[in-house]
Amino acid sequence: MHTPRALLIAICLLMAPAAAFAQDVGIVESAETINKGNFKIRVNPLLVFGKGAEDNTGGIAAMIGYGFTSRFDMEGGVAFYDGLTFVAANAEFWVLKEAPLDVSVAGGWHQRFTDQSDDYHGIDLTFLASGHVGKRLEIYGGLDLAFEGLFSDTDNFTKAHIVPGVEFKVNDAIDLVAEFGIAITDAARHYLTGGIAFYWK
């Protein structure tokens, strides 16, 4: 383990502010984009922790993506909770490669469908920094923003999380990922998720 790199990654994890598309499908990846010409499918269950007297809520998300270049990919998918469904899509650009960290920026959109309140959609913005602390292990920190209720009759609000996570490379075709979303706005909720990603060409 390289001490300077590990220290720099740890600082990024502590300093990264965030707001949350992560509460619907999660970030659940490092800053590296999908390899050019490759497909990816990811499945991850989520546990969202209620605030105060609120119940905890469980859900499951699935995303599929494609690497268009060595630095750019796109993903889309769904998340299902009890009485609530999210449909989401995003595009990610790998800004810095191993300098000494990997850094990416992603923008996206999501739509919420529910029988419990009004449907709405929002815009997502995610900043990621990650780095290898071993041959197969990466740690990452995310700034994940969701601007909710835009272009609708509902009140606008923003959900924000700090999102530290780990990604373990089983082999060239499989990654295991886990993260904890730390809510930093009143509208956000802490969450825990872990999942598996498969890659193929």
Where are the regions a protein language model picked out?
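Cleavable N-terminal export/targeting peptides
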Residues: 1-31
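Outer-membrane beta-barrel transmembrane domain signature
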Residues: 25-56, 67, 84, 95, ...
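Transmembrane beta-barrel domains of bacterial outer-membrane proteins
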Residues: 63-80, 86-92
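Short, acidic/polar
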Residues: 58-61
